[in-house]
UniProtKB/Swiss-Prot annotation:
This is Large ribosomal subunit protein uL5. Transmembrane segments: none annotated. Disulfide bonds: none annotated. GO terms for cellular component: ribonucleoprotein complex; ribosome. Belongs to the universal ribosomal protein uL5 family. Keywords: Ribonucleoprotein, Ribosomal protein, RNA-binding, rRNA-binding, tRNA-binding. PANTHER family: 60S RIBOSOMAL PROTEIN L11-RELATED. HAMAP family: Ribosomal_uL5_B.
Amino acid sequence: MDKNKEMTPTTPSLARLETFFKEKVTPNLVERFQYKNAMLVPKLKKISINIGVGAAAAEPKLLEIALQELAQITGQKPQIRKSKKAISNFKLREGQAIGCRVTLRRKAMYEFFDRFVSLAVPRIRDFRGLSDTSFDGRGNYTVGVREQIIFPEIDIDKVPRISGMDISFVTSASTDEEAYVLLSELGMPFKKKNN
């Protein structure tokens, strides 16, 4: 082996989906929406994953489990989310930890998106496609997952309680149509539209 080759820092490799976006999706979107150049093409900016553990007020151990599971799924340490105000009906005090969140960007974002679409979504029970009505009007898409066990990183035998999560895909698209086409091109399995 050449010693100089070993010492040079390697450039970070692109995620498989990021390469696919640059080579295939960008030209398709430029053609479809008639952008003047490729820099105007909407991009996936970040993915935010949120787990709300309302029962953590009574059982703090549930929050620790949610933190551990979210770290396994994303490969990143989650932030603890605290309540903003006290609600007596839910026995909730202001500042009490009630959930956790992770925000993924760049390579980690593309790798999570790839795993979500190709490994996790097909494991959803009775899956017929993701709803295309969960866009927010500004080009962002949120999907609710009912069971964390759809992710292959979670061992079903070690899960004490089934919990869900919200996954938000934030894009630079200005309209829902552009975001829908972007996510579809990246492989998001939306329900087929009846024509």
